[in-house]
Regions:
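Membrane-embedded alpha-helical segments of transport systems
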Residues: 64-70, 92-111, 222, 260-272
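Membrane-interface alpha-helices at helix entry/exit sites of multi-pass transporters
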Residues: 53-55, 72, 86-100, 249-261
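Hydrophobic alpha-helical segments and helix pairs
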Residues: 85-136
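Extended non-transmembrane interhelical loops and adjacent amphipathic helices
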Residues: 56-85
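Alpha-helical transmembrane segments and their lipid-water interface positions
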Residues: 36, 40, 70, 74, ...
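Predominantly cytoplasmic-facing regulatory/coupling regions of multi-pass membrane proteins
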Residues: 1-59, 116-226, 257, 264-285
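Transmembrane alpha-helix interface/packing and boundary motifs in multi-pass membrane proteins
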Residues: 65-67, 218-236
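Re-entrant/interfacial helical elements at transmembrane boundaries that shape
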Residues: 75-84, 229-246
Length: 285
């Protein structure tokens, strides 16, 4: 029988020998930033030569700006602030490709979570959401991998011509660069997932590997598709985490603590650092 808890005593956690789990989750945060910076360096390099240090600063600056925008849409504009202004249009194309790689990864793992959820808790609404997610994933994949093929069909449309410049720039990316961006997005997603499972373990949430992975996949997908602002996202994260994980544990305080901890580690801390870098950049200019 699973041990059911409704509250967590922080002192007990630190005294129980579980503190290394928290340390490991914290250590993985710089790895997250490093992976995303490496991806940005590869993709942004098509528009302008980018050093790894500059890529790290761009990623942190993007996180800082994303925290005050709906569904973090300000992340990529924030990154462009660190790049040369004359390359802005090219970098917008880079941002578009990076965003598509991120969404392709998100929906791929999200569908795995949805398949698991439908198998465990079948229902009409869950099935409809799964089908819709598969359709959206297919569209994203076609745009990501076959842009050059299908874009020709829309060249005659006046509204599409306004985006022709971005389209031509997107064609400059090689298949290898696209796959590298996609692979790094997937690796970063798995690191996020590992952090969450580590924090849940720290909070004594009993989960099997399959339960933990699939539910975490679904959690990250859900918070990405639900409209929100990062500053107000914490409440949504809490509600989604309780809805998904209450099926495996009654430790509501532990679930919420792990969710809040992940939010602080991967968003708040990098956003603070990024804000300092942005302020410093403005002062230097």
């Amino acid at each position: 029988m699973q041990k059911q808890l409704t509250q967590v005593d922080p002192e007990d956690l630190f005294m129980s020998g579980l503190t290394p789990f928290l340390v490991l989750a914290l250590v993985l945060m710089p790895l997250n930033i490093a992976i995303e910076a490496f991806k940005w360096k590869i993709l942004a390099g098509v528009a302008q030569p980018t050093s790894y240090t500059q890529a790290v600063k761009s990623v942190l600056g993007g996180i800082a700006l994303s925290i005050v925008t709906p569904n973090r849409i300000g992340e990529y504009p924030g990154r462009i602030l660190y790049m040369k202004r004359k390359n802005t249009i090219r970098l917008i194309s880079v941002a578009i490709l990076a965003a598509f790689a991120q969404f392709l990864t998100l929906f791929t793992f999200g569908i795995i979570g949805l398949l698991y959820y439908n198998a465990q808790f079948p229902g009409t609404m869950a099935l409809i959401i799964l089908i819709a997610a598969i359709i959206i994933l297919t569209i994203i994949a076609l745009i990501f991998f076959r842009f050059e093929s299908w874009s020709a069909y829309f060249e005659h449309l006046s509204w599409f011509r306004r985006f022709r410049t971005y389209g031509h720039l997107l064609k400059r990316f090689t298949t290898s660069q696209q796959l590298q961006g996609l692979a790094l997005s997937a690796i970063r997603f798995l690191v996020f997932t590992a952090q969450y499972l580590i924090l849940l373990r720290w909070m004594n949430i009993p989960l099997s590997p399959v339960e933990g992975l699939c539910t975490a996949f679904l959690f990250f997908w859900a918070i990405a598709v639900i409209p929100s602002i990062a500053l107000a996202e914490l409440g949504i994260r809490g509600q989604v985490s309780l809805f998904l994980f209450h099926n495996f544990s009654a430790n509501t305080m532990g679930i919420l603590a792990a969710t809040i901890g992940l939010w602080c580690i991967n968003l708040v801390i990098p956003a603070v650092v990024g804000s300092i870098l942005l302020i410093r950049m403005r002062l230097l200019r």
